[in-house]
């Protein structure tokens, strides 16, 4: 019965499988599952090929560096640093990645190779720290004295018995300088000679030009000596005498320079010969000319007397040229008083200017013949 029961179960399983396959095929699920399985198989095969052909993880530059003695020494120092501080996880990554699981030297061998003597100061730290300290000491060596340049190796100049350095170097420098100067002087002798000739010719041209200039200046100075005489003559520096003093009509006291009165305020001189319009010409005989002039003088003196100017026939003509009047006696009066007198005189002149316009004239009277021999129009 057991066998029959097993056969019945097998038949039922087969029927169930067939029914399941048929159902999955009808629904399309079985075909999709087959396609996915097929794709997964292909992908697995392709990835397997890539993994087989993949290059190994090897750092070529690091491999070359570690093949040298210094490279292995550096790697040993780093490994010793990690071992000293018990950095096991970092060391577990460092050794496989650098392929230094074997062959790195220990602390004692490193100290011997680097020349480091194990002492109390070095035991308290890794060897890498001691290497850095020694490098810093070498850098500071020239200033601290270690590794500095030995100045005794440099040969100093010999010293005299008194302890002073001799000056043998300075003569050699002087000799070199003299040799250089001689060479330059020889090389520059030819251009200097040419330049000197050019300068001499140029100087001669300039000298001739200057001599011509000086001769021309002397000729010009000789051609116009009158101008120099006129400039140097003191006669032209003297002030022009005032009309009243020269003509003898009215004499006033000498005015100080800078006084308020000026020649512009003096009465105008008009129609100097208005009263002598009917006089005969000067080419007539002396008797006729003297008679007419005397008549005119008498007429002028009469008019002046009628105006009260104080000049009559009895006045001496010499006093007019000496510029003496009733104010000449006050020459020692102060400047302030003279200014006041000048102002008063100017006021009087303004009042009498209209009366003197027709009487202004210039007469030169001969004291011997009492006859005017020269007449001049002042206007």
Swiss-Prot record:
Q: What residues bear Phosphotyrosine in this entry?
A: 317
Report the locations given in the UniProt record.
Cytoplasm, Cytoskeleton, Microtubule organizing center, Centrosome; Cytoplasm, Cytoskeleton, Microtubule organizing center, Centrosome, Centriole; Cytoplasm, Cytoskeleton, Cilium basal body
This one is known as: Centrosomal protein 43
On subunit structure and binding partners, the annotation says: Homodimer. Part of a ternary complex that contains CEP350, CEP43 and MAPRE1. Interacts directly with CEP350 and MAPRE1. Interacts with CEP19. Interacts (via N-terminus) with CEP350 (via C-terminus).
Residue ranges of the TM segments: none
Composition-biased stretches (Polar residues): 163-184
Q: Which residues carry the post-translational modification Phosphothreonine, per the record?
A: 143, 170, 214
Q: Where is the composition biased (Low complexity)?
A: 185-196, 266-282
Looking at the record, the residues that make up the LisH domain are 70-102
Whether Lipoprotein counts among this entry's keywords is no
GO terms for biological process, alphabetical: cell projection organization; microtubule anchoring
| Location, primary (coarse class) | cytoplasm
List-wise, which residues carry Phosphoserine? 152, 160, 182, 281, 306
Q: Where is this region: Disordered?
A: 139-196, 216-288
Q: Which UniProt keywords apply?
A: Cell projection, Cilium biogenesis/degradation, Cytoplasm, Cytoskeleton, Phosphoprotein
Locations of Acidic residues compositional bias?
225-236
Q: Where is the composition biased (Basic and acidic residues)?
A: 239-255
Which top-level group of life is the source organism from?
A: Eukaryota
Cite the source lineage: Eukaryota, Metazoa, Chordata, Craniata, Vertebrata
List the source organism. Macaca fascicularis (Crab-eating macaque)
